[in-house]
Structures are given as C-alpha cells and as structure tokens.
C-alpha cells in the first residue's frame, strides 16, 4: 500500500481478529526508531505487549523474554531479533517495511528475519503479512507469480499524495546556490512562516565527509577500508563508517606538511549547524546514529518533534520510514542521487525505496504536503519513478535491467568470502 494508506490500521485489525481466537502476534519493524511510535499506537487498542530490540539493557531484555515465556504477553513488537521471541500459539506474523535491508544480519550469527518468519509461520500454520509501499523486487516477483498473495492499497486515507519536485543541482550551482536550491530554501521559509514542520534527509552523518590536501591531493582514509574518513566536529574525530576505526583530526598533511587542509562534503551534523544559521525561525533537531546512542534517545527525539519543540527534523535514512507527524508539510532530500553511486546492483532499488518512503512523511494529515528532491542525476529512472509514486513502472524498468545483466530474481548470486590471520 502507498505511504499513508492505513497499513498500520490493517495490521491492528488483523491482530484484533487473532487475539479473539486466543492466539498471539509478532510484529517486526526495521528500525529501533519506529518501535516507540508503533508501541504507543498499539497500546491505544491492546495490552500485554512486549518490546524487543538491541537498545534495551540486558536486564530489560531478560525481563521481556521471561514475560513472553511465562505467557504474560499477547503481542511482541521489535526489530529483527524479535522474530526469535519464545511466543507460543502464534496466530499471525507481520513484517512492516518488508523491503528494508536491516532485516538481514550481516555479522555472526548470520540470518534473515524474513526467512525465519516464513519458517515460523509454516510451523505455526499462520499467515505472514509482508507490508510495504515499496516491496523488494524479490517479494513483488513472488506476488506476481502467485507464490505470495498480492493485496494492494492504492490510495492514501486522505487521498492527498504530496506534490514532488526534482531539482537539478548542476543548474543550481551555476546560479550560485550550493547546499540548498532556491526552491527548497523558499519552501522551508514558507513552512516556518506557517508554523508547520519540515523533514530534511541527508543520508550521510558526521560534519565533513572528506578531509583532503589541496596541495598534493592527499585524502585522509581508513587504513583498513581505504575509504575517506568522515569528520565529526563534536568529538573532533575522524571516523570510518564501515569498520568504526577512529582517530583525531590531523592539522597538517602527512605527505607535504601543508597546514591548510580542505574540509569537503557535508553530513547531518554540519547541515544542522547550517540550517540553524540561515533560518532565524529554525529549531532543528538531528536524528542519526550519533544522536541516538543513549537509552530512549529515539523516543525523546520523536516526542520532542511531535510536541513541536522543534520545527525541523534532520536525519539519515532512519527518518525515512514509518514516522507519522501531522504538522510535517515539507520534506527536503539533499543528495537524493547519492545512493546511485554505491557499487551494488540494488542501488537503483534502494534509491527508489528511500525517496518514495521519505516522500511519504509529508502531508499525512489534512495539510497539503510538498517534497523537494535535490541531486546531480535527477533524470535517472529510479528518481523519476519515485517522484511519480510509480512502483509498477519502476519494477518493470528494473526487471529489464536485472534480466539483461543476469541479476536476481532471475539468477542467484553467491558471495564467497576468504580471510586469514
């Protein structure tokens, strides 16, 4: 179903039916940031709910686990690990935002929560619901070939999809506009004047994304991964976002001793500073891995923004899915084409999903929503289809490419990893 079509309401009615049959439910969400909102929504209608995710302390996990084992719980809500909850008599398993790659654990023990869910649904002879506005190519193919049953919700509850604009930043640079296009700048001002709220997505955390020497071309890279380190101003550290290698920022080039290094690129930390500086009415809050490390941080940011203590929410992809704020009328996407540069055959699919999902945060109430997507490659099919909310068109285009290049779902890929000490 499209974003805002009422999938959560459908989930709750299905759970209600299951509970009346004296059975139980597991509900998976892709991000810890989504659990507080979903649990709060569920608590308006149900009791005996357990919450499981990696943000809980060991003691809290143990307490929830014991409640489930002792038959004190009817509904388990959580991130991917919640699929292992020792719940008996399961009547339904629901995976929200089923397309999300976070359901797959890439480190030991390796598992895909969707595969485990399929196994548990078969074991308990219960339905498995895979919900998404942008299903994975593999899931949609299974639905098209009758392996899964396809149920579609094609309209928003308020029949009010946001108006989406694409902005070519190559043209904006020629006009002297850099970080924000004139359109996005004007729309932010308009929103703040109306006392409405704004979400800005920049899928890169940190302050500067590259520290380089203009004299000799040296770039400060991770010694393990050989990719540029990202500067984090708050801690004054250079961090690798792949292996978490950390070091303090250098003041001189190790190659030529030049002490005038260039800080290039922008992450969410720098964007928050910039937005607060150029918009006098802006009260900006940031949601990314760096601001949500502490206990209950997701919930606090969510509640503060919902209570309108802030009018601009800046974040990475964790703000793209599932969040529902009635006063948000504008979503701005900076570097909307950045994920197309990732060397992965799914980069087009991931780009489409991210843009479609974050666009769905705008105009979810009676207020009209707008979306501005900025990028240097906005004529790419995945961006155009996302701006038109055209999943089927994207799917057909993507399948042509996958078939020609022998990619899934037509062929299986095998990863062989070799390592030694």
What are these regions (language model features)?
Residues 1-417:
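Inter-lobe coupling/hinge segments of SF2-like helicase ATPases
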Residues 419-421:
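Short, intrinsically disordered, charge-balanced linker/junction segments flanking boundaries
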